[in-house]
Amino acid sequence: MPESADPRDRLIVALDLPDVEAAERLVARIGDAVTFYKIGYRLAYAGGLDFAARLAKSGKKTFLDLKLHDIGNTVEEGVRSASALGATFLTVHAYPQTMRAAVRGRGSGLKILAVTVLTSYDDADAAEAGYALPVADLVARRAEQAAEIGIDGIVCSAAEAGAVRHRIGPSGLIVTPGIRPAGAEAGDQKRVMTPGQARAAGIDHVVVGRPITGADDPRAVAQRIVAEMEDA
């Protein structure tokens, strides 16, 4: 399992906020307690990509959670554009053609993460979408394909981390959303763990959103999560 020199890097705060101004306020409140931020669709479409570039220039790490999935050339060029923003991580859907294109476009500084199955999905959701395999088997199969193609890491729930690690080896990254501190509500995530449980399961980075962004003291919550992972 890859180790970061800075334990704060293990926590990625999801900036699922309505606009850049709200994101700027949150980042200022958290200060140096957090080094890594995730920007998804909501903020990306509201000026978040320029904000991501500014974060990167200020020394923060950024995770563009855009889940690219398109024809190969479009994905390849999109990945190159993300790399130019100074992003550290970028997500693509774990389809072989998409992953191969992303690897071609990533350059030297960007790491590509494959999204196997959304953590809001359970077996019933997978069946409804037409998949014959249960979620755990689907995640394992896609992780194996990603490793063969040369993807840097996998996004999966903590429940699947052991199976994923077996398939991607010790050097691959595992990034896990659906992380909730003890006592927090699960929200729309169906496969969740606490930060300490996730770290003990071999997770490299955990993604936490509402428990931090909605807290009265987001800096303190972030610090507790980092400490919990260090103690695991």
UniProtKB/Swiss-Prot annotation:
- GO molecular-function terms, A-Z: orotidine-5'-phosphate decarboxylase activity
InterPro entries xref list: Aldolase_TIM, OMPdecase, OMPdecase_AS, OMPdecase_bac, OMPdeCOase_dom, RibuloseP-bd_barrel
Which NCBIfam families does the UniProt entry name for this protein? Answer: PRK00230.1 (NF001273), pyrF (TIGR01740)
Give the family, as the similarity comment puts it. Belongs to the OMP decarboxylase family. Type 1 subfamily.
* Protein name (Swiss-Prot/TrEMBL): Orotidine 5'-phosphate decarboxylase
| GO CC, any one term | cytosol
Q: Where substrate is bound, by residue?
A: 16, 38, 65-74, 119, 180, 189, 209-210
Which residues carry out catalysis? K67
One GO biological process this protein is involved in is: 'de novo' UMP biosynthetic process
* EC assignment: 4.1.1.23
Give, as in the UniProt entry, the pathway in which the protein acts: Pyrimidine metabolism; UMP biosynthesis via de novo pathway; UMP from orotate: step 2/2
Which keywords does UniProt give here? Decarboxylase, Lyase, Pyrimidine biosynthesis
Q: Does the keyword Zinc apply?
A: no
Q: Which reaction does it catalyse?
A: orotidine 5'-phosphate + H(+) = UMP + CO2
Q: What is its biological role? A: Catalyzes the decarboxylation of orotidine 5'-monophosphate (OMP) to uridine 5'-monophosphate (UMP).
Subunit notes for this chain?
Homodimer.
Instruction: Answer yes or no on keyword Transport.
Output: no
Classify the source by domain of life. Bacteria
Give the source species.
Answer: Methylorubrum extorquens (strain CM4 / NCIMB 13688)
Xref: Pfam families? OMPdecase
Which SUPFAM superfamilies is this protein grouped with?
Answer: Ribulose-phoshate binding barrel
